Structures are given as structure tokens and as C-alpha cells.
Amino acid sequence: MIARSELKKELINAGIRPSVQRLAIYEYVKSHHTHPTADVVYDALRDVLGSLSLTTVYNTLKLFVDAGLVQLLTIDDTFRCFDGDTTSHAHFRCDSCGRIVDLKIKSDFLAMVDGLGGFEIKEAQLYLKGICPICKRKN
């Protein structure tokens, strides 16, 4: 778990004022590797932060995404979640249980894409879908 003082520094370095709510939301996303949705973050923090609204959570997460502190994952059109790990990695979503797992990328997967000459790539995300080992064993 990252120290709260370190998280506060990260917000300040990104030009974000570290209010109590912002710091709590950032700490939650960085420390929970479950790829939470905005609703999950809100449900987890609303009792701790009495004045927290769902709108505040959405706006704060957007602020973090825009600052490059958090990744927005849009694995399909209906599901949006957040990842506090901004390093290069892939995501696997189980079609059965819905769990999202981080996967290491052994090489530059963009090198496998033909025709990128002249393009400036600002972001690339690799999503894999299928059945996870746990669900596969159950069936």
C-alpha cells in the first residue's frame, strides 16, 4: 500500500489540489486492484466521507484520468472501470464472472501492428476476453 503522503504528493505534482475527498478516492483506486467502477468507489467511501456524492466521484475520477494518474478502462460499451496502475499492461475480462485481471506484456505489442508509420500513438490498451481459470474449473 502506498503511503498517504506519497499519494498527496502525486496529486500535487499533477496540479490537483488534494482535498480530503480527492485523496480518499485516489487512495481507494490506487490500493484496490479490483478495477472499481465509480459506483463501487462511491459505495465504499460514502459512509466514511459523509458529504460525498456520486457526481463528485465521477468528476474526480475524470480529473485523475485527464491528469494521467488513473486509467479509464472501457472493455465494452456498457462497462467502465478504473485502474490505478498506469504502467503498460493488458487486461483480461472473464465473460463468466466479470472479473478483470492485470496481465504483464512481455514485449511492445504495438510492434505487432502493421501500418503505424507516421502515426503518433498517445494511448494503447490491450483487452482480452474469455473464461478465467477459476470459472473454467467450475464448468
Feature annotation, model-predicted:
Residues 2-15:
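Short, Lys/Arg-enriched N-terminal segment that forms or immediately precedes the first helix
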Residues 10, 27-32, 44:
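Short amphipathic alpha-helical elements of helix-turn-helix/winged-helix folds
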Residues 40-46, 57:
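A short acidic, leucine-rich amphipathic alpha-helix
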Residues 37, 53-54:
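Short coil turns linking two alpha-helices in DNA-binding domains
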Residues 18-20, 32-37:
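Short capping segments at the starts of secondary-structure elements
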